[in-house]
């Protein structure tokens, strides 16, 4: 086992604090609408330019092991805030640095670290409660656009596209961000339910120009197993032909004689039909077939449920206003399922998302939820160079998470002002001793840090801005760093999601509290490389 180096008390805290400062100072320059860029060297390819706090934090690794521990603890703040709220990583880092600095001073002056931490926790609890009470629900499309614009560092175009995407697919819909081949931002919205399965034979195509199958007001037959023989299907096929409506068959597979018979009937013009494979695999396939059944008001033909193909009636079939099938995808628009059934299924999937511990399962469940509840929107981000595209994509990702957070828990005045306004919640908090009272005062001072940093990044004096904000008690009154004006931040469109502000403060205080209460640090001793031995002379004469 390698030898370890141990540092205690002030020596440990000083080394750790240096690491915290290096990390925070690199991240904090990106805060606010006039935040600066950070250039990150890559081992291959062009350097990456970003204004995303968590991206900067993830790149920092320090040579000194003890300093690095402090930096990595601060990186944890950014990562946790990013995971919970998707944005606010720089705010969380700035808050954590402020709490750690003030806490370290208090510990150095002889106060009990555990009581300080208890005081910090009491203060954060009170502030979070006050933030929740003051959050305003997001109702208008314009407010969503404002949240997205702020999070995208003032890019109104990104804000507009995200608001449009949210409006079209709803709060439960899936919005994905991809890199575009052009220099513009593009939005593509897929209506209805789409899954990655195309037609089983090109002979089913009805629109030769677009090379796809288009069925209007169609029936849908959902079968869990393979179809290789149509004998059992003849009664239901005859009923469909009499109705004069098209039919889409979704089964594990349609092969051999069954597929040939369907193609021949389609070509002869007797039957408007198409067949596709069921999406997914194993148990996920069963769940997705059930989703399609609920969306279209049909029933999955499954022997496990005691439903046989030969006993199928028209009531078993699903219905949809429009179905489009191309080589790789099938889209079902406007299914005939009842709103109550779809709502019940959505609630069931949401419960599964809450329970699952697997990121992969959660992602797949969210995809299913989107297909049932809203739709899928794809935002394609373009730019002149690869570096620009990546930087813009980072900002769109941040903005997307911020808008979701705003819809979830509401909005607050932006620019760090919300934290300043709820400081009154700390007045009169009951504490067990003076050290806990100092912990509360640490948080009172620390929550000014985001406003000060935003002001400094915009070229203003932080203490002057904080002083002017304190002169007025109006909750929404603040400073717009983009324009340099004071006024109602809600009206100016400078707003932050309540979830982002809350998560930033909670995560910052959590990690900062641990750093303040650290009394010893252990790291591996760096290995000293000795001088290599001189090679033997090999019989040379001197």
Curated annotation (Swiss-Prot):
Organism: Rhizobium meliloti (strain 1021) (Ensifer meliloti)
Record keyword Cytoplasm present: yes
Entry's EC annotation: 5.6.1.7
UniProt keyword annotations, A-Z: ATP-binding, Chaperone, Cytoplasm, Isomerase, Nucleotide-binding, Stress response
InterPro entries, per the entry: Chaperonin_Cpn60_CS, Cpn60/GroEL, Cpn60/GroEL/TCP-1, GroEL-like_apical_dom_sf, GROEL-like_equatorial_sf, TCP-1-like_intermed_sf
Cell location: Cytoplasm
Annotated GO biological process: protein refolding
Subunit structure: Forms a cylinder of 14 subunits composed of two heptameric rings stacked back-to-back. Interacts with the co-chaperonin GroES.
Homology family: Belongs to the chaperonin (HSP60) family.
PROSITE patterns: CHAPERONINS_CPN60
Encoding gene per record: groEL2
Source taxon at top rank: Bacteria
Lineage: Bacteria, Pseudomonadati, Pseudomonadota, Alphaproteobacteria, Hyphomicrobiales
GO-annotated cellular components: cytoplasm
Annotated ATP binding sites: 30-33, 51, 87-91, 415, 496
Main location: cytoplasm
Function, in words: Together with its co-chaperonin GroES, plays an essential role in assisting protein folding. The GroEL-GroES system forms a nano-cage that allows encapsulation of the non-native substrate proteins and provides a physical environment optimized to promote and accelerate protein folding.
Enzymatic reactions: ATP + H2O + a folded polypeptide = ADP + phosphate + an unfolded polypeptide
The protein's name: Chaperonin GroEL 2
GO MF term (any one): ATP-dependent protein folding chaperone
Induction: By heat shock.
Enzyme class: isomerase
């Amino acid at each position: 086992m390698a030898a370890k180096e141990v540092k205690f008390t002030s020596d440990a805290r000083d080394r750790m604090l240096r690491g915290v400062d290096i990390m925070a100072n690199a991240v904090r320059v990106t805060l606010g609408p006039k935040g600066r860029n950070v250039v990150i060297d890559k081992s291959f390819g062009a350097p990456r330019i970003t204004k995303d706090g968590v991206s900067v934090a993830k790149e920092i690794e320090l040579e000194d092991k003890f300093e690095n521990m402090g930096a990595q603890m601060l990186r944890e703040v950014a990562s946790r805030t990013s995971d919970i709220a998707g944005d606010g990583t720089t705010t969380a880092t700035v808050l954590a640095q402020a709490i750690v600095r003030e806490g370290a001073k208090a510990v150095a002056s002889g106060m009990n670290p555990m009581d300080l931490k208890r005081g910090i926790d009491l203060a954060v609890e009170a502030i979070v409660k006050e933030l929740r009470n003051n959050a305003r629900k997001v109702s208008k499309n314009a407010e969503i656009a404002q949240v997205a614009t702020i999070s995208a560092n003032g890019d109104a175009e990104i804000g507009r596209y995200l608001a449009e995407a949210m409006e079209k697919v709803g709060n439960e819909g899936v919005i994905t961000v991809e890199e575009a081949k052009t220099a513009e931002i593009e939005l593509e919205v897929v209506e209805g339910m789409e899954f990655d399965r195309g037609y089983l034979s090109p002979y089913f195509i009805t629109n030769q120009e677009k090379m796809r199958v288009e069925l209007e007001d169609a029936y849908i037959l959902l079968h869990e197993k393979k179809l290789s023989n149509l004998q059992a299907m003849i009664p239901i096929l005859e009923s469909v032909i009499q109705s004069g409506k098209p039919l889409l068959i979704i089964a594990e597979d349609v092969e051999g004689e069954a597929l040939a018979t369907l193609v021949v009937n389609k070509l002869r013009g007797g039957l408007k039909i198409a067949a596709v494979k069921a999406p997914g695999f194993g148990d996920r396939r069963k769940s997705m077939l059930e989703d399609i059944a609920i969306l279209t008001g049909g029933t999955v033909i499954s022997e496990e449920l005691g439903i046989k193909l030969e006993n199928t009636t028209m009531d078993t079939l699903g219905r949809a206003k429009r179905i489009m099938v191309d080589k790789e995808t099938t889209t079902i628009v406007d299914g005939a399922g009842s709103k109550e059934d779809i709502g019940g299924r959505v609630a069931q999937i949401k419960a599964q998302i809450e329970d699952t511990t697997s990121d992969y399962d959660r992602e797949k469940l969210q995809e299913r939820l989107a297909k049932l509840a809203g739709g899928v929107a794809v935002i394609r981000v373009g730019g002149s160079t690869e570096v620009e595209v990546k930087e813009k994509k980072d900002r769109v990702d941040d903005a997307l998470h911020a808008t979701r957070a705003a819809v979830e828990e509401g909005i607050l005045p932006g620019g760090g002002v919300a934290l300043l306004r709820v400081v009154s919640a700390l007045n009169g908090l009951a504490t067990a001793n003076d050290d806990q009272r100092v912990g509360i005062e640490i948080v009172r001072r620390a929550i000014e840090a985001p406003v000060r940093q935003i002001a400094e990044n915009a070229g203003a004096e932080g203490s002057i801005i904080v002083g002017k904000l304190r002169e007025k008690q109006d909750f929404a009154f603040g400073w717009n760093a983009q324009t340099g004006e004071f006024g109602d931040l809600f009206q100016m469109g400078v707003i932050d999601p309540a979830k982002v502000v809350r998560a930033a403060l909670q995560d910052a205080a959590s990690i900062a509290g641990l750093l303040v209460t650290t009394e010893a640090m252990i790291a591996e001793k760096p290995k000293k490389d000795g001088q290599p031995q001189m090679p033997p002379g090999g019989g040379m004469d001197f």
